[in-house]
A protein has these predicted regions:
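Phosphate/diphosphate-binding loops
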Residues: 209-234, 283-285, 336-340, 504
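Conserved acidic/glycine
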Residues: 1-7, 241-463
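Glycine-rich beta-alpha junction loops
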Residues: 28, 167-169, 209, 235-242, ...
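Active-site nucleophile and cofactor-binding loops and adjacent substrate-binding regions
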Residues: 1-4, 24-26, 60, 78-99, ...
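Short acidic, glycine/serine/threonine-rich loops at helix termini
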Residues: 10, 32-37, 144-148, 166, ...
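Conserved thiamine diphosphate
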Residues: 112, 124-130, 181-219, 263-292
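Short glycine-enriched loops at secondary-structure junctions
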Residues: 177, 181-184, 237-240, 444-450, ...
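Cofactor-binding active-site loop characterized by glycine-rich and histidine/acidic residues
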Residues: 1-163, 168-170, 174-192, 197
């Protein structure tokens, strides 16, 4: 988030309880500003601490800055989404945060426009007033799925705010090689709503202009929340003071003039000047805040690292105790000491180093029996089981709602079964599903003509266009629409018309 802090603070101030953020890996300022992320959690994720008490966002399974609200409780039941701001798990596949944001916003539309969902909305919506914010860097707006979702949002008129952090580069590639007219807001100008029809509200604002940023997000949030007008907030003149990543400094590809401008025009520098010029604070107070922040950050970093290493150290010490017992009972130092020495040479061992040492020790003492070897084998088995829980559990639901626990219902046939087309069976099955208010179907040609294969024939007339909904040819945003809506307690059925379309 370096160089994008101020716009993220302004965005956060426009959010309300029940809103959603579907962002990417530069949004830590938003997470902290809305109270969804603490600095101890930030550093715990940096070190990959596989304990949700330290890293509740991912339990050490995601890269740093991939923040996520916990949507389910320990029993696999939904938590109340209306009483907090909700963060969808951050993602590194650039633009992939956008399709699911479309679905989250679409759920607000359904909760507002379908009274039959009222009793199901308790944990998910208060009258459909929730806005979904989604963020992206300027270079990633070139991804096809981004354009697809922009178009879908304009068609659907859903409460979504697209934010673009524009620092003029995609790693080393400048914007003139990325975006038509070197500006995503200019390139998308045809989507601007006007007397010709509905569309998006497009707002351009500078990354260092705090009053302008506040006004932009207040305006966008009001339009999205009250009128269901999708908005694009294009934040220009962002900086990237640390370069794109650890792969190299931005000094490799930015001109001397550009580097000098970034030093002077960084949002934090100009924000500080604005505070002082308007006498909201003084230099000594701001310096005290700076100094305290550095001390606090270093403390949280050290504490997080110590907490992570202590979790490893418990198993490391257990291994060393067993190794000593093994040495005492076998008197074979030549077999064991090289393994221990190799482990001790690892400055900061992780769990895989312990597994590696344990397996090497078992192989070295494969011809020995006795309590010490059995204890080592049990320790290794237990450690591998714990590691499976740490790193591989909950890939699918482990609650009572697991699909693997659904009991099979075998078909029953009459003595002389009636022969009907398969599409008729599917049609009746879909009709049965749609009796559940949470279920809806969307896809290409599913509505008016009832699907190209007639499996949905007559169902739009029976249940209405918000239950069986025609869409454009836009596969990735359809999938995202389903994913996002399902995260808000709904049960979408998304049709990708033909199997080969999934390649899109």
């Amino acid at each position: 988030g370096d160089g994008k802090e101020l716009c993220q603070i302004a965005l956060a101030r426009s959010m309300q309880t029940g809103d959603y953020i579907s962002g990417y890996y530069r949004d830590q300022t938003i997470g902290v500003a809305v109270g969804d992320l603490t600095w101890p959690q930030y550093f715990a994720q940096l070190y990959g601490h596989p304990d949700i008490n330290f890293d509740p966002h991912s339990g050490g399974r995601q890269m740093n800055n991939h923040h996520a609200t916990r949507w389910l409780d320990e029993h696999g039941e939904w938590k109340d989404q209306t009483s907090r701001i909700n963060s969808v798990a951050g993602i590194s596949s650039t633009a992939a945060q956008t399709p699911r944001a479309l679905g989250i916003a679409y759920a607000s539309k359904l909760y507002r426009e379908r009274p039959d969902l009222t009793e199901h909305a308790t944990l998910f919506s208060k009258g459909g007033q929730e806005v979904c914010y989604t963020t992206i860097g300027d270079a990633s707006t070139s991804e096809g799925m981004y354009f697809e979702c922009i178009n879908a949002a304009g068609v659907l008129q859903v409460p979504i705010i697209f934010s673009v952090w524009d620092d003029g580069y995609g790693i080393s590639v400048p914007i003139e090689f990325q975006t038509t007219k070197s500006s995503i807001s200019k390139a998308l100008a045809g989507f601007q709503r006007n007397e010709d029809g509905k569309g998006l509200e497009i707002i351009e604002v500078k990354a260092w202009d705090y009053p302008g940023l506040l006004a932009a997000y207040v305006r966008a949030a009001k339009l999205a929340r009250e009128e269901f007008v999708p908005c694009l907030v294009h934040v220009i003149e962002c900086t990237q003071p640390q370069g794109h990543s650890a792969s190299g400094s931005h000094e490799r590809y930015k001109s001397t003039d550009r580097l000098a401008w970034e030093h002077e025009a960084d949002c934090n520098v100009l924000f500080r000047q604005w505070i002082l010029e308007n006498k909201y604070s003084d230099e000594s107070t701001l310096k005290a805040i700076d100094d305290a922040a550095i001390i606090e950050a270093r403390k949280h970093q050290k504490d997080a690292f110590a907490a992570y290493m202590s979790s490893v150290d418990v198993d490391r010490k257990a291994y060393l105790r067993i190794a000593k017992n093994l040495l005492d009972s076998t008197n074979e130092p030549s077999l064991l000491e090289p393994i221990i020495e190799e482990l001790n040479q690892v400055s900061y061992p992780i769990f895989s180093d312990l597994v590696k040492a344990g397996r090497k020790t078992l192989r070295a003492f494969r011809f020995y029996q006795g309590p010490a070897v059995k204890l080592l084998r049990k320790w290794l088995t237990d450690l591998e089981d714990k590691n499976r829980r740490r790193f591989s559990s909950h890939q699918m639901s482990e609650s009572v709602h697991s699909p693997l626990l659904v009991k099979e219902v075998k078909p029953l046939y009459e003595k002389v079964p009636q022969q009907v087309d398969g599409r008729e069976i599917l049609n009746q099955s879909f009709s049965n599903f749609l009796e559940d208010p949470r279920v809806f179907i969307l896809g290409e040609d599913v509505g008016k003509i009832g699907d190209v294969n007639q499996t949905l024939a007559g169902l739009q007339d029976k249940f209405g266009p918000l239950k069986v909904t025609d869409t454009g040819i836009r596969e990735i945003s359809l999938v995202g629409q389903g994913v996002g809506a399902s995260m808000r307690g709904l049960k979408p059925i998304v049709e990708i018309q033909y199997l080969d379309y999934i390649l899109y």
